[in-house]
Amino acid sequence: MDLHSCLNSYFLLLLLCLLNITTINSTKPLEQETVLFGGNFPAFYVIGDSLVDSGNNNHLTTMVKSNFPPYGSDFEGGKATGRFSNGKTIADYIAIYYGLPLVPAYLGLSQEEKNSISTGINYASAGCGILPQTGRQIGTCLSLSVQVDMFQETITNNLKKNFKKSELREHLAESLFMIAIGVNDYTFLFNETTDANEFANKLLHDYLLQIERLHKLGARKFFINNIKPLGCYPNVVAKTVPRGSCNDALNFAVSIFNTKLRKSLSRMTQKFIKTSFLYSDYYNYMLGLRGPSSNQVGSSLLNVTSPCCPNVYDGGQLTSCKPGSIACKAPDTHIFFDPFHPTQLANYMYAIACFHERSICHVILED
């Protein structure tokens, strides 16, 4: 067995111990928890950014792409698919958890394929955000509203051909809808002069409008992933003083949005009957990988500050993993594959934590 295989086996066993899977809360689950954590979903629809993009940006005129090595080195066949990792994304692991196939990218499907797929589609687009103007400087972008537009087209042009009206209503009501977007709004549009509260309110307004659109289209079960601690990611910590410390001001700004989002979802459970929200606290999960405080590296086994690609990352000068970039030999020793995105191992760790720790993923209840 080579070093890479040994590390894979070692870390998987280690993670099972660290996450203490056997200590799941044994109290009787709520009805919503039974549905969202153990539901038999017919389909999985994904809306978001590069965290969950499965290849839509391959088909866009944009500088943000990952359809080249060393991306995908640990994916099936070692192929770069357009996922921003060395392997699977968190959306992939969620699909696997629910017994569904990996969700294909909308723009990579032929019309015939769109007509035949009934287990879900991925509309996520790297570099894009909640606001329409986010990411325009890097090329064509599929904003949150555009992705919802595409889902509406899926209903009109494809799903209606496969389902009777009552069947389609049931299909949509029983399917799971994941939304994982918002970090690029902070990356491109937020700075030290921006009022964090006003900015969060602006994002939230547009975000909730799109949830309402999805609900009107028939969605009833949502998986809402909050925004990551951007201030602790390699592209940021490489430029902080002291180097490696988080930008706490940026994290605080993001946390304002996350808090508002969670409260708004709680109110929505009262507004929308028979609608459930599973809230994923991705922010605190990723922050927790660093250790007890945001400026303390919490693991001697995993590199939590530097990316695997590029392997040489000096002061933020190399800001992306590009064609020809040399990656580290063992991605499973890193939390981040590139300066902006987690490794497959980190995504796998998240999936375990999400479905076995209610502090990470939990059903939103009424206030």
Swiss-Prot record:
<dbReference type="GO" id="GO:0016042">
    <property type="term" value="P:lipid catabolic process"/>
</dbReference>
<protein>
    <recommendedName>
        <fullName>GDSL esterase/lipase At2g03980</fullName>
        <ecNumber>3.1.1.-</ecNumber>
    </recommendedName>
</protein>
<keyword id="KW-0443">Lipid metabolism</keyword>
<dbReference type="GO" id="GO:0016788">
    <property type="term" value="F:hydrolase activity, acting on ester bonds"/>
</dbReference>
<comment type="similarity">
    <text>Belongs to the 'GDSL' lipolytic enzyme family.</text>
</comment>
<keyword id="KW-0442">Lipid degradation</keyword>
<feature type="active site">
    <location>
        <position position="341"/>
    </location>
</feature>
<dbReference type="Pfam" id="PF00657">
    <property type="entry name" value="Lipase_GDSL"/>
</dbReference>
<keyword id="KW-0964">Secreted</keyword>
<keyword id="KW-0732">Signal</keyword>
<feature type="signal peptide">
    <location>
        <begin position="1"/>
        <end position="26"/>
    </location>
</feature>
<dbReference type="InterPro" id="IPR035669">
    <property type="entry name" value="SGNH_plant_lipase-like"/>
</dbReference>
<feature type="glycosylation site" description="N-linked (GlcNAc...) asparagine">
    <location>
        <position position="25"/>
    </location>
</feature>
<keyword id="KW-0325">Glycoprotein</keyword>
<feature type="glycosylation site" description="N-linked (GlcNAc...) asparagine">
    <location>
        <position position="191"/>
    </location>
</feature>
<feature type="glycosylation site" description="N-linked (GlcNAc...) asparagine">
    <location>
        <position position="303"/>
    </location>
</feature>
<dbReference type="GO" id="GO:0005576">
    <property type="term" value="C:extracellular region"/>
</dbReference>
<dbReference type="InterPro" id="IPR051238">
    <property type="entry name" value="GDSL_esterase/lipase"/>
</dbReference>
<feature type="active site">
    <location>
        <position position="338"/>
    </location>
</feature>
<dbReference type="InterPro" id="IPR036514">
    <property type="entry name" value="SGNH_hydro_sf"/>
</dbReference>
<keyword id="KW-0378">Hydrolase</keyword>
<dbReference type="InterPro" id="IPR001087">
    <property type="entry name" value="GDSL"/>
</dbReference>
<feature type="active site" description="Nucleophile">
    <location>
        <position position="50"/>
    </location>
</feature>
